[in-house]
Amino acid sequence: MFSLGRNTEKEGGLSARASLLMLAIAMALATPFAIAEATSGDRTDPVRNVPLACELVSTPGMPARANVNVVHTANVCGIVGTDVELQSRTDLGGRVHDYAFVGTMGGGFRIFDVTDPAHPSHAGGYIDSGWENDVQVRGDIVVATFDGVAGEDSSASTCLKTRYPEANGQGVDIYRLDYNELTATFETNLLTCVANPPGGAHNATLHTSGQWLAIEDCCSDWAIDVIDLRNVLQGQAVHRYRLIDASRRDSAGRCPADAAFTCVVMTRPDGSSASSLWQPHDVHFSRDGRTMYVAAIQSTFIVDVRNVLAGQARTISIIPNISEPGGLDNPHNISISHQADISSDGRILVISDERGGGLSETRCLEQPNGLMGGLHFWALARIPGVPETQGASPSNPVKLGSYFNPNPNSAIDPLQEFIDLLPRAERGCTVHVFRLGGNGSVSPGPILTGYDGVSRMPNRELSTAYYGAGVWVLSFAGRPSSTDGIAEDSRTTWGNTLGWNVMPGADTWSAKEYKGAIYAGDMLRGFDVYRYTG
């Protein structure tokens, strides 16, 4: 039997039945907030608290609304899927097992054995519900995030509520995995938690070394909280620094005089003010862990973090959202810098634009030339055959171009009448969470040697989620061409489409390739597995 996890804050822990009861209560309490969010203005990462019923999405052989070179192979329903991370383990008999760690909104994280991608099986998890509940994993350490929908307390974390009653449920829980080599399943135990009010943990990223955690709060604190994990196995996780935007430094509650942490104001490379540019949403690291790439909503930062645990974070460069004429009416400019990952060879930085925050930008599903959030490519080193990149470097990024999916005609969604009954019936279609070939969870290569999790795609290919437009695979090796039989969007100036799949009910949060399969968290469908056949 796999373990649902137990809460070590209370003697004897929580039984599975008690945990499920807490989950049901938390989801019931969270529902009004999700509905309220559906009617609010643009925000990043929309919340949907109710998945489609299992009988609607788990039918074997259900045809896609549209697909080329990407085939649907499996579904786990009944959860609101978000981010996915991968790793592998070896059982007692010497067989390698592959695992998907799936974040959920309102249901805690789940672990699935995907050694046979067509037949995922439960292998563990932890019922500690809350929003957004993105997941990170490095070896035996797992992190889950809580930030509410609009800052409200929607977390069922007993640790946060017991240790930090004034934190309003905002922060992260940190767990230890115990792998049973005989059963090839996991027991999950709570190690500790870290509160970071008032903004909470929208995302969190483990550093490649495992020595620290970056908690990203884009939408309230405008900060990255640096959490010291050097003694985490002893239950110690210490908030050391808050890397904060200048405009938030003196805001109430952000850098209080009695705080245990030290605030560090982020600046431009020359030390001048970068006020209102630093809204960290997601981070990625170089292979050696010395450089951090920060998708900061209003811009994208490249930062030297080799001495971050001593309070030093030096800005190397800032990539502006507006790099071409026309402002935000020009899709080649970025509205929301959402994710910024470096290619496995360190030469190309890929930045995603989550236009409309995933909520309001639906024109790309309603009209052929509607605005959509795309992928933007910047050279950080010379790219053979592209002479304008001769002087490219981390301190001098050079724009290569942008990619927009060709928005193929899809069949009418047979599940639309059921989707219309949910709190937010309209699905956005902007790009969301992606994985580059040759990369693991947080950087090029594995986050920890021996646990794999690295995409097998070539280093100029990627898989990505597109919310209501499903799962896509593309090459970013060069300029677009339609000679392969796929007509590219006329606005694309870099990259080529390799395939896609839009399943009924798709509202896909993340799509990450591993060993030939693409694993996708989906807010309506749950957890999906695809196979790229190109």
Task: Describe every region a protein language model picked out.
Residues 1-16:
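N-terminal secretory signal peptides that target proteins for export/translocation
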Residues 10-13, 28, 34, 38:
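Intrinsically disordered, low-complexity repeat segments enriched in small/polar residues
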Residues 13-21, 459, 515:
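Hydrophobic alpha-helical segments and their boundary regions
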Residues 19-32:
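Bacterial N-terminal signal peptides
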Residues 35-534:
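Feature marking well-ordered beta-strand scaffolds used for ligand recognition
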